[in-house]
Amino acid sequence: MMVVVLALAGAMSTQVSAQVLRDAAFNSIGRINGNGVVRDGTMHSIGSFDADGKVRDAKGNAIGVIKELEIFDTEGTRIGYINTDGTVHDGESNILGYISINDGKVTDAEKKTIGFARGVRVDWIACYYFFHFFGK
């Protein structure tokens, strides 16, 4: 299981350069670089992902943690997780949406396109689009 989890988490992160985050109309709305720094559409830093799984806001405060495709708040409560097929669930196992491993398309539970994020780790995509860690 650990190998599958690590393979999926890394499946969309083979490049070190910044990857563009896009809305449903394919407009650029931000970037995530290979070091985990998240930037908004005006290139201001709005947070980051640490190597140890911590998710931080623009001021460096911990706002969550990622552990093996599970997402936790700062109190340790699981608020969501991602299946190996890219399905994103909330903490109560309700489907929030989907992340296409093939093309980076992000859709909501009704399969309506909400964005695109190719070349970005799937757990980082979920934190940005579904768990709104960066006010998005």
Residue ranges and their predicted role:
Residues 3-40, 44-45, 51-53, 61-62, ...:
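Long terminal segments
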